[in-house]
UniProtKB/Swiss-Prot annotation:
Residues 32-143 form the C-type lectin domain. Heterodimer; disulfide-linked. Expressed by the venom gland. GO terms for cellular component: extracellular region. It is found in: Secreted. Shows greater sequence similarity to the beta than alpha subunits compared to other heterodimer snaclecs. This is Snaclec 1. The lineage of its organism: Eukaryota, Metazoa, Chordata, Craniata, Vertebrata. Keywords: Disulfide bond, Hemostasis impairing toxin, Secreted, Signal, Toxin. Disulfide bonds join 25-36, 53-142, 119-134. Gene3D superfamilies: Mannose-Binding Protein A, subunit A. Residues 1-23 form the signal peptide.
Length: 146
């Protein structure tokens, strides 16, 4: 009996010490490299998701990625929760930034882009980025600095 109590106490100490590793993040957020992340299952447009993130915490936005390790972390927390393929990330309007050229070398002097802006989703299985109309609805991940 004394051994059981000792083991239980030891496990409690380990649990409490590990729970402090993400102490700068709220309990329902995950911690990685000084940032807090939370997966939201509800589906929203890109703009609504970004506004929702901003309402959750000061300086919170749709997730941004800055290393392959961060992506691996995001995949590890996103896919098990959503079991979905695509989530909004904090990129949009990439076509306005691209340098376009025709394969024959002529100048791009005529453009017929859709009126609707494009935003970016990430595949939760392998982090491939895909542009989608911002008006579509997807789940999303919010991020803020701890």
């Amino acid at each position: 009996m004394g051994r059981f109590i000792f083991m239980s106490f030891g496990l409690l100490v380990v649990f409490l010490s590990l729970s402090g590793t993400g102490a700068d993040c709220p309990s329902d957020w995950s911690s990685y490299e000084g940032h807090c992340y939370r997966v939201f299952q509800q589906e929203m447009t890109w703009e609504a998701a970004e506004q929702f993130c901003a309402q959750q915490r000061k300086e919170s936005h749709l997730v941004s990625f800055h290393s392959s390790e961060e992506v691996d972390f995001l995949v590890s927390i996103t896919y098990p929760i959503l079991k979905a393929d695509l989530v909004w990330i904090g990129l949009r309007d990439i076509w306005n930034e691209c340098r376009l050229e025709w394969t024959d070398g002529t100048k791009v002097d005529y453009k017929e882009w859709s009126e609707e802006p494009e935003c970016i989703v990430s595949k939760t299985t392998d982090n491939q980025w895909i542009s989608r109309p911002c008006s579509r609805t997807y789940s999303f991940v919010c991020k803020f600095q701890a």
